[in-house]
């Protein structure tokens, strides 16, 4: 038995010396999973989360699921396999993501959701999201003002599987529908995509040449819409977005898009990491699982202070 123990210890020491034979579990790894980074909002989330995690002494594993629930599930498996201490997740669907978050919980890994909620409570430790309804009302109020309280308009909606798309649309309509001379002539989903928004806007414009405004569920679609309008020589159409991206900031400053609504992507992601750190070190949980962060209207008056989804002093 002593010989066996000596051999076992020798093998263990040899494996450590080689640095290749032992499983690679990171004692201080935080996994950060978001949609694709070609959308600057999601990139800002990842950058903010990674910066805060490294500041607090963690290693990071950054992955993108491209709004594919199956791919997201595989990434949760990767995080589990790597022994992550926490997962920061902007999920791939309110219903489709519940099982993946539960899988992480069952493996002893807490999840901290940002931007998008899931249709379940008690599965994630935290769900930190923008106050999308409040933000949408801000955007709609500015849109109505810019439209002079009348005229035909178009609404571009996000992914149907994303609860934010519906919440923002409801917030828009709860304001706009109070103005009887504001008339919706088209409402279509462009799935948060700039390319789809460009194509949809071209088609809508052909059928409705008399439109006066476009209100968009996010900035990426707003950028697609303004590009299509400008290509058609329609610089008179009012476009309002939602997110607070640098691209839209620049468009506002140059007289293109008229307004957007800032949701604090960077700060939201950093708060999630801070809460994950408190949980990892002390098992401290936030007072509320679902937490709302208010949005801010961005227009020509304050666009110059906007940088990477945050207002500077």
UniProtKB/Swiss-Prot annotation:
Alphabetical list of Pfam families matching this protein: Peripla_BP_4 (PF13407)
GO terms of molecular function: carbohydrate binding
Keywords: Periplasm, Plasmid, Signal, Sugar transport, Transport
Gene3D superfamilies membership: 3.40.50.2300
GO annotation, cellular component aspect: periplasmic space
CDD domains, per database record: PBP1_TmRBP-like
Residues at which D-apiofuranose binds: 39, 115-116, 162-164, 168, 218, 243, 263
Job of this protein: Part of an ABC transporter complex involved in D-apiose import. Binds D-apiose, D-ribose and D-ribulose.
Family classification: Belongs to the bacterial solute-binding protein 2 family.
Protein name: D-apiose import binding protein
Species assigned in the record: Rhizobium etli (strain ATCC 51251 / DSM 11541 / JCM 21823 / NBRC 15573 / CFN 42)
Lineage: Bacteria, Pseudomonadati, Pseudomonadota, Alphaproteobacteria, Hyphomicrobiales
């Amino acid at each position: 038995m002593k010989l066996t123990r000596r051999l076992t210890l020798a093998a263990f020491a040899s494996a450590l010396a080689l640095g290749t034979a032992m499983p690679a579990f990171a004692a201080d790894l935080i996994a950060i999973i978001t949609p694709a980074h070609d959308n600057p909002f999601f990139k800002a989330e990842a950058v903010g989360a990674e910066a805060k995690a490294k500041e607090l002494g963690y290693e990071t594993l950054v992955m993108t699921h491209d709004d594919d629930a199956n791919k997201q599930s595989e990434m949760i498996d990767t995080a589990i396999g790597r022994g992550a201490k926490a997962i920061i997740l902007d999920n791939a669907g309110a219903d489709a993501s519940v099982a993946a978050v539960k899988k992480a919980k069952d493996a002893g890994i807490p999840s901290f959701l940002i931007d998008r909620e899931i249709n379940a409570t008690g599965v994630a430790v935290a769900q930190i999201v923008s106050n999308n309804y409040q933000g949408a009302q801000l955007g709609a109020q500015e849109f109505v003002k810019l439209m002079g309280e009348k005229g035909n308009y178009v609404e571009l909606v996000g992914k149907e599987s994303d609860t934010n798309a519906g919440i923002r649309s409801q917030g828009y309509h709860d304001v706009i529908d109070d103005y009887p001379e504001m008339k919706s002539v088209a409402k279509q989903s462009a799935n948060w995509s700039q390319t789809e928004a460009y194509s949809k806007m071209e088609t809508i414009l052909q059928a409705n040449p008399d439109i006066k405004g476009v209100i968009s569920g996010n900035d990426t679609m707003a950028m697609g819409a303004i590009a299509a309008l400008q290509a058609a020589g329609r610089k008179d159409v009012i476009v309002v977005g939602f997110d607070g991206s640098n691209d839209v900031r620049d468009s506002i400053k140059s007289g293109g898009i008229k307004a957007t609504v800032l949701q604090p992507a960077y700060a939201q992601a950093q708060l999630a990491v801070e809460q994950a750190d408190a949980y990892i070190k002390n098992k401290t949980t936030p007072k509320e699982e679902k937490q709302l962060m208010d949005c801010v209207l961005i227009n020509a008056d304050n666009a110059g202070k906007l940088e990477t989804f945050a207002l500077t002093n």
